[in-house]
Amino acid sequence: MRKFLRVNSPIILLENYSAAIPKPRWQVYGERYAERRAINKSFEFTWPQYQRKPLNQLLMSSLIQQTDSHCSYCDAYPLMSADNTIDHFKPKSKYPIEVCKWENLYVVCAHCQKEKGVNYDEKLLRPDEQGYDFYHYFYYDFTTHEIKILWGLPEEEAQRAETTLQIMNFNHPAMKESRRLSYEGFADRPDFPPNHKTHRFMFE
Protein backbone atom coordinates (compact mmCIF):
# COMPACT_ATOMS: atom_id res chain seq x y z
CA MET A 1 0.00 0.00 0.00
CA ARG A 2 1.80 3.06 -1.30
CA LYS A 3 1.37 6.47 0.29
CA PHE A 4 -0.43 9.15 -1.70
CA LEU A 5 -1.48 12.71 -0.98
CA ARG A 6 -5.22 13.31 -1.00
CA VAL A 7 -6.26 16.23 -3.17
CA ASN A 8 -8.75 18.77 -1.89
CA SER A 9 -12.38 17.76 -1.92
CA PRO A 10 -14.24 18.61 -5.13
CA ILE A 11 -16.35 21.70 -4.54
CA ILE A 12 -19.48 19.77 -5.45
CA LEU A 13 -19.30 18.01 -2.07
CA LEU A 14 -18.59 21.14 -0.05
CA GLU A 15 -21.17 23.48 -1.52
CA ASN A 16 -24.39 24.06 0.39
CA TYR A 17 -27.06 21.67 -0.80
CA SER A 18 -29.46 24.56 -1.40
CA ALA A 19 -30.44 27.95 -0.05
CA ALA A 20 -33.12 26.25 2.02
CA ILE A 21 -30.69 23.60 3.32
CA PRO A 22 -27.40 25.39 4.12
CA LYS A 23 -25.35 22.26 4.74
CA PRO A 24 -22.53 20.73 2.67
CA ARG A 25 -23.91 18.49 -0.04
CA TRP A 26 -21.99 15.43 1.21
CA GLN A 27 -23.56 15.82 4.65
CA VAL A 28 -27.10 16.07 3.31
CA TYR A 29 -26.60 12.99 1.17
CA GLY A 30 -25.27 11.12 4.19
CA GLU A 31 -28.09 12.20 6.47
CA ARG A 32 -30.70 11.13 3.94
CA TYR A 33 -29.09 7.75 3.50
CA ALA A 34 -28.83 7.31 7.28
CA GLU A 35 -32.53 8.13 7.68
CA ARG A 36 -33.51 5.53 5.10
CA ARG A 37 -31.23 2.93 6.67
CA ALA A 38 -32.81 3.61 10.06
CA ILE A 39 -36.23 2.81 8.61
CA ASN A 40 -35.09 -0.12 6.49
CA LYS A 41 -31.78 -1.85 7.28
CA SER A 42 -31.81 -3.56 3.88
CA PHE A 43 -32.08 -0.25 2.00
CA GLU A 44 -29.40 -0.28 -0.70
CA PHE A 45 -27.32 2.77 -1.44
CA THR A 46 -27.29 4.29 -4.90
CA TRP A 47 -25.17 7.27 -5.79
CA PRO A 48 -27.14 10.54 -5.73
CA GLN A 49 -27.65 12.40 -8.97
CA TYR A 50 -26.20 15.86 -9.48
CA GLN A 51 -27.21 17.72 -12.61
CA ARG A 52 -28.49 14.42 -14.02
CA LYS A 53 -25.21 12.60 -13.49
CA PRO A 54 -24.38 10.03 -10.79
CA LEU A 55 -22.13 11.57 -8.17
CA ASN A 56 -19.56 8.78 -8.38
CA GLN A 57 -18.94 9.59 -12.05
CA LEU A 58 -18.32 13.22 -11.15
CA LEU A 59 -15.83 12.30 -8.43
CA MET A 60 -13.91 9.61 -10.29
CA SER A 61 -11.48 11.88 -12.13
CA SER A 62 -10.30 13.49 -8.89
CA LEU A 63 -9.92 10.12 -7.17
CA ILE A 64 -7.90 8.74 -10.07
CA GLN A 65 -5.77 11.87 -10.26
CA GLN A 66 -4.48 11.51 -6.71
CA THR A 67 -3.29 7.92 -7.24
CA ASP A 68 -2.01 8.39 -10.82
CA SER A 69 -4.55 5.82 -12.03
CA HIS A 70 -3.36 3.18 -9.54
CA CYS A 71 -5.45 1.28 -7.02
CA SER A 72 -5.45 3.17 -3.72
CA TYR A 73 -4.72 -0.01 -1.77
CA CYS A 74 -2.56 -2.49 -3.72
CA ASP A 75 -1.23 0.07 -6.27
CA ALA A 76 -2.28 -2.09 -9.25
CA TYR A 77 -1.97 -0.30 -12.60
CA PRO A 78 -3.62 0.54 -14.85
CA LEU A 79 -7.15 0.59 -13.52
CA MET A 80 -9.49 -0.88 -16.10
CA SER A 81 -13.05 0.35 -16.62
CA ALA A 82 -14.33 -2.60 -14.58
CA ASP A 83 -11.90 -1.67 -11.81
CA ASN A 84 -13.05 1.90 -11.44
CA THR A 85 -14.98 1.30 -8.26
CA ILE A 86 -15.14 3.52 -5.21
CA ASP A 87 -14.53 1.92 -1.86
CA HIS A 88 -15.99 3.38 1.31
CA PHE A 89 -13.10 3.03 3.77
CA LYS A 90 -15.61 3.10 6.60
CA PRO A 91 -18.42 0.85 5.32
CA LYS A 92 -21.57 2.71 4.44
CA SER A 93 -23.73 0.18 6.27
CA LYS A 94 -22.14 1.14 9.60
CA TYR A 95 -21.18 4.76 8.86
CA PRO A 96 -24.01 5.99 6.62
CA ILE A 97 -23.35 9.67 7.36
CA GLU A 98 -19.94 9.36 5.65
CA VAL A 99 -21.25 7.70 2.50
CA CYS A 100 -20.32 10.73 0.38
CA LYS A 101 -17.62 12.24 2.56
CA TRP A 102 -14.53 12.89 0.46
CA GLU A 103 -12.06 11.49 2.98
CA ASN A 104 -13.95 8.19 3.05
CA LEU A 105 -13.75 7.53 -0.69
CA TYR A 106 -10.97 5.58 -2.43
CA VAL A 107 -10.68 4.38 -6.02
CA VAL A 108 -9.73 0.71 -5.99
CA CYS A 109 -9.34 -2.30 -8.23
CA ALA A 110 -11.98 -5.02 -8.32
CA HIS A 111 -9.74 -7.39 -6.35
CA CYS A 112 -9.27 -5.00 -3.42
CA GLN A 113 -12.94 -4.05 -3.45
CA LYS A 114 -13.84 -7.72 -3.07
CA GLU A 115 -11.19 -8.56 -0.46
CA LYS A 116 -11.80 -5.58 1.82
CA GLY A 117 -15.56 -5.60 1.32
CA VAL A 118 -17.34 -4.22 4.38
CA ASN A 119 -14.49 -5.08 6.74
CA TYR A 120 -13.19 -2.24 8.87
CA ASP A 121 -11.24 -1.69 12.06
CA GLU A 122 -10.11 1.56 13.63
CA LYS A 123 -6.54 0.23 13.50
CA LEU A 124 -6.68 -0.09 9.71
CA LEU A 125 -3.98 2.00 8.02
CA ARG A 126 -4.95 4.54 5.38
CA PRO A 127 -2.59 5.16 2.44
CA ASP A 128 -3.19 8.90 2.71
CA GLU A 129 -3.03 9.35 6.47
CA GLN A 130 -0.46 11.72 7.90
CA GLY A 131 2.77 9.95 8.75
CA TYR A 132 2.02 6.77 6.82
CA ASP A 133 4.81 5.22 4.78
CA PHE A 134 4.96 1.66 3.46
CA TYR A 135 8.48 1.05 4.72
CA HIS A 136 7.67 2.34 8.19
CA TYR A 137 5.31 -0.60 8.75
CA PHE A 138 6.24 -3.23 6.17
CA TYR A 139 9.00 -4.69 4.09
CA TYR A 140 8.84 -6.56 0.82
CA ASP A 141 10.15 -10.11 0.56
CA PHE A 142 11.56 -10.38 -2.97
CA THR A 143 11.87 -14.16 -2.62
CA THR A 144 8.28 -15.01 -1.70
CA HIS A 145 6.78 -11.74 -2.97
CA GLU A 146 4.96 -11.33 0.31
CA ILE A 147 4.40 -8.11 2.20
CA LYS A 148 5.65 -8.61 5.75
CA ILE A 149 5.49 -6.59 8.93
CA LEU A 150 8.67 -4.74 9.83
CA TRP A 151 10.51 -6.13 12.83
CA GLY A 152 10.72 -4.15 16.05
CA LEU A 153 7.64 -1.98 15.64
CA PRO A 154 5.98 -0.63 18.79
CA GLU A 155 3.04 -2.84 19.77
CA GLU A 156 0.36 -0.40 18.60
CA GLU A 157 1.98 0.07 15.19
CA ALA A 158 2.52 -3.68 14.80
CA GLN A 159 -1.17 -4.24 15.52
CA ARG A 160 -2.12 -1.69 12.87
CA ALA A 161 0.15 -3.36 10.34
CA GLU A 162 -1.26 -6.82 11.15
CA THR A 163 -4.85 -5.56 10.94
CA THR A 164 -4.13 -3.99 7.57
CA LEU A 165 -2.57 -7.15 6.14
CA GLN A 166 -5.52 -9.23 7.32
CA ILE A 167 -8.32 -6.96 6.14
CA MET A 168 -6.73 -6.04 2.81
CA ASN A 169 -5.44 -9.59 2.25
CA PHE A 170 -2.36 -8.27 0.46
CA ASN A 171 -0.76 -11.72 0.48
CA HIS A 172 -3.56 -13.39 -1.43
CA PRO A 173 -1.98 -15.74 -4.03
CA ALA A 174 -3.23 -13.54 -6.87
CA MET A 175 -1.61 -10.48 -5.30
CA LYS A 176 1.73 -12.24 -4.82
CA GLU A 177 1.68 -13.43 -8.42
CA SER A 178 0.86 -9.94 -9.67
CA ARG A 179 3.77 -8.47 -7.74
CA ARG A 180 6.12 -11.20 -8.96
CA LEU A 181 5.24 -10.47 -12.58
CA SER A 182 5.66 -6.75 -12.00
CA TYR A 183 9.05 -7.19 -10.38
CA GLU A 184 10.33 -9.49 -13.11
CA GLY A 185 9.00 -7.16 -15.78
CA PHE A 186 10.39 -3.89 -14.43
CA ALA A 187 13.43 -4.73 -12.29
CA ASP A 188 15.79 -4.38 -15.25
CA ARG A 189 14.05 -1.32 -16.70
CA PRO A 190 15.06 1.61 -14.45
CA ASP A 191 14.19 4.15 -17.15
CA PHE A 192 10.57 2.98 -17.42
CA PRO A 193 8.23 5.79 -16.22
CA PRO A 194 7.68 5.15 -12.49
CA ASN A 195 3.98 5.97 -12.58
CA HIS A 196 3.44 3.39 -15.32
CA LYS A 197 4.67 0.58 -13.09
CA THR A 198 2.29 -1.50 -11.03
CA HIS A 199 3.06 -1.94 -7.31
CA ARG A 200 5.45 1.01 -7.37
CA PHE A 201 6.53 0.62 -3.73
CA MET A 202 8.72 -2.35 -4.76
CA PHE A 203 10.96 -0.09 -6.82
CA GLU A 204 11.35 2.79 -4.38
Q: Where are these predicted regions, by residue range?
A:
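Histidine-centered nuclease catalytic patch
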Residues: 73-107, 119-132, 136
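Short Fe-S-cluster ligation motifs
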Residues: 98-113, 135-157
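C-terminal, charged low-complexity interaction regions
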Residues: 156-204
